[in-house]
């Protein structure tokens, strides 16, 4: 039969009549093997050591221990020994660990204060009683900012031709030719993307504050102008001046290149000696910019809360060709005024999608910048469109976590204090640059009128990635102060290239007093993104692959490459009228008209796009855990900077109109 002898003492009768005794938890048998005594004597023996976690009971309830008769676990009748020990442990790895174990009679409170650092103060007194007070306070603020800027420029040229023919029935004859030059406009694309991601995590009994601000701006401009003048003089009684002027202007975040030709024919017949005085105004309405396609693209992408601005403008100026024939007898002036209707399809595709998105989560600072520059040049007659798309993608991620946890038991008899201070900083930086070039040429021939268009588009995109992480590890024991500062830095770069080519020709033949016209158009499109793809007219095939892998722990690097190519060609001829088109993995257009003997069209397209992407992270973490009475506030800052670089080239030759688009994406990620 079991017998309870008090203080948790249980005796059991053994089979042989002997008595076997057991003690409840917290007690042990005395030497007489019949009585139970408490295992723990009241002493100052437990000294705080550093752990990976701070444990502290904010309100300790225990009783002073003395040798005597116990009435229950944790309860003691003190016999005059009231001094005790407080074990206080400092902070390790952004976590303050304090273990306070109290055995004694009294109440306890533990105080932990953290303001960007973890400071733990533990005070206890014991004189038969133990008192521990504690408060945990952690404050944290994080700010994230991301900016992106992209610029692009493009140039184009055009030609205008004026022809004057003079025939004098006299002694002298003169033939003059006037040539005018029309202007094309290049393409510039600026894209700014700002993406900011911040994370603030606060765990513990208390309050936390996280504030993140992100801004992204993308701007691109391109301008091109051109003029052409032609003067013609015939020696004899007939003097003819022909002037052809063509101008084309395209402006936008992307600008298009346009060229135009103007042909004016003036025929003067003079009867008699030294006559043939006819003003053959070879107005060849020098159509500058047949189709000035200005394509401006500003793309800003992000996720979350933030602001992003993008501006895209495109203007196109178009003129046409006109032919005039005038005949006069004597000093009659035959003015052949050719009005050229410039089909200025100013497609200025100003895709100014300023979707500048900034995603912010939590606390910290992430800053990333990306720059992309794409240039395209188109030369020839007709219209060339080049677009350089630069995309700057900035991703900044910063996480600050502050946690204070206080758990455990307090065994305190006496007084002790402890202080732990932790400081950690993480910085991530990534830089990248991107350039893109594009060239285009176009030719047009015809006894009547011929136009040629060339388009070149180049885009460059680059992405830089930087990652940095900082770790702060602090160990403090009891009375004392520990301060640790850690920094981490990481950089990453990314590059991308893309090429595209396109060709096209147009010819026209006219005879008699009529005129023949021929037009040709060429367009090219190529895209190369991290996994590049592209399209071109005629037959254009673009392939591009890009891979961006980023790993960041303390130090992170990221690289990305992308390439794309596109080519297109087309030709067309007609007797009276005709059309031709070329098709491929893109678009091809053919236009033909003849108000004379024949006309023909041809298309050519080439575009290339390259994209490189890199990613980096910078991380700074401060963790404090606290359980008990008090407030916890976490403060931490992290900075991440990412810049993207990409390059792309595109060339296109052809007639009439070509459109090319190139985009570049730069991604920078910074985490703190």
Curated annotation (Swiss-Prot):
UniProt-recorded name of the protein: Putative per-hexamer repeat protein 5
Compositionally biased intervals (Low complexity): 390-424, 470-486, 538-552, 618-636
Region forming the signal peptide: none
Record field: compositional bias (Gly residues): 141-161, 171-191, 215-233, 243-263, 273-295, 303-355, 365-389, 425-469, 487-537, 553-617, 637-653, 663-672
Organism: Mus musculus
UniProt xrefs under PANTHER family: FIBROIN HEAVY CHAIN FIB-H LIKE PROTEIN, PER-HEXAMER REPEAT PROTEIN 5-RELATED
Record-linked InterPro entries: Diverse_Func_Domain-Protein
Highest taxon in the source lineage: Eukaryota
Location of region: Disordered: 141-193, 213-672
């Amino acid at each position: 039969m079991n017998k309870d002898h008090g203080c948790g003492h249980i005796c059991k009768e053994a089979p042989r009549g002997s008595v076997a005794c057991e003690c409840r938890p917290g007690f042990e048998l005395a030497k007489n093997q019949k009585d139970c005594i408490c295992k723990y004597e009241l002493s100052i023996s437990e000294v705080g050591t550093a752990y990976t976690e701070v444990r502290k009971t904010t309100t300790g309830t225990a009783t002073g221990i003395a040798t005597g008769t116990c009435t229950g676990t944790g309860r003691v009748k003190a016999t005059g020994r009231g001094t005790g020990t407080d074990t206080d442990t400092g902070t390790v790895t952004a976590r303050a660990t304090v273990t306070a174990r109290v055995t004694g009679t009294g109440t306890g409170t533990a105080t932990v204060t953290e303001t960007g650092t973890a400071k733990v103060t533990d005070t206890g007194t014991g004189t038969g009683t133990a008192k521990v007070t504690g408060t945990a306070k952690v404050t944290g603020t994080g700010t994230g900012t991301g900016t992106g800027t992209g610029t692009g420029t493009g140039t184009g040229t055009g030609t205008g031709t004026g022809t004057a023919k003079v025939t004098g029935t006299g002694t002298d004859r003169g033939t003059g030719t006037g040539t005018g030059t029309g202007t094309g406009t290049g393409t510039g694309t600026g894209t700014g993307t700002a993406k900011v991601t911040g994370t603030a995590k606060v765990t513990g009994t208390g309050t936390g504050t996280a504030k993140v601000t992100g801004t992204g701006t993308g701007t691109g401009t391109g301008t091109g102008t051109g003029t052409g003048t032609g003067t013609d003089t015939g020696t004899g009684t007939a003097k003819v001046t022909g002037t052809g002027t063509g101008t084309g202007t395209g402006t936008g975040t992307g600008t298009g290149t346009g060229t135009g030709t103007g042909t004016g024919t003036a025929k003067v017949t003079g009867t008699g000696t030294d006559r043939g005085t006819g003003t053959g105004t070879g107005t060849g309405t020098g159509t500058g910019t047949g189709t000035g396609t200005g394509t401006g693209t500003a793309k800003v992408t992000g996720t979350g809360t933030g602001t992003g601005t993008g501006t895209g403008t495109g203007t196109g100026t178009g003129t046409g060709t006109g032919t005039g024939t005038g005949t006069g007898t004597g000093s009659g002036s035959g003015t052949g005024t050719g009005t050229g209707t410039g089909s200025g399809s100013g497609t200025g595709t100003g895709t100014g999608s300023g979707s500048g998105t900034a995603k912010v989560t939590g606390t910290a600072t992430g800053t990333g910048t990306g720059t992309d520059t794409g240039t395209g040049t188109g030369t020839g007659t007709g219209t060339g469109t080049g677009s350089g798309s630069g995309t700057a993608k900035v991703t900044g991620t910063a996480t600050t976590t502050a946690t204070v946890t206080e758990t455990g038991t307090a065994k305190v008899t006496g007084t002790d204090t402890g202080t732990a201070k932790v400081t950690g900083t993480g910085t991530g930086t990534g830089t990248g640059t991107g350039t893109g070039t594009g060239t285009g040429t176009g030719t047009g021939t015809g006894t009547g009128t011929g136009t040629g268009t060339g388009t070149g588009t180049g885009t460059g995109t680059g992405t830089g990635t930087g990652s940095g992480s900082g770790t702060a590890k602090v160990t403090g024991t009891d009375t004392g102060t520990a301060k640790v500062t850690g920094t981490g830095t990481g950089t990453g770069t990314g590059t991308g290239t893309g090429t595209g080519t396109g060709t096209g020709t147009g010819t026209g033949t006219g005879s008699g007093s009529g005129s023949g016209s021929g037009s040709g158009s060429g367009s090219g499109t190529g895209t190369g993104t991290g996994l590049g793809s592209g399209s071109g007219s005629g037959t254009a095939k673009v392939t591009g692959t890009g891979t961006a892998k980023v790993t960041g722990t303390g130090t992170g690097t990221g690289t990305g490459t992308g390439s794309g190519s596109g080519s297109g060609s087309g030709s067309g001829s007609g007797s009276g009228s005709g059309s031709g088109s070329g098709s491929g993995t893109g678009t091809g257009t053919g236009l033909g008209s003849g108000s004379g003997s024949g006309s023909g069209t041809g298309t050519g397209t080439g575009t290339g796009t390259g994209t490189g992407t890199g990613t980096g992270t910078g991380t700074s973490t401060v963790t404090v855990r606290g359980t008990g009475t008090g407030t916890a506030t976490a403060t931490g800052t992290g900075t991440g900077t990412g810049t993207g670089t990409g390059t792309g080239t595109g060339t296109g030759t052809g007639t009439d109109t070509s459109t090319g688009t190139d985009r570049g994406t730069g991604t920078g990620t910074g985490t703190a």
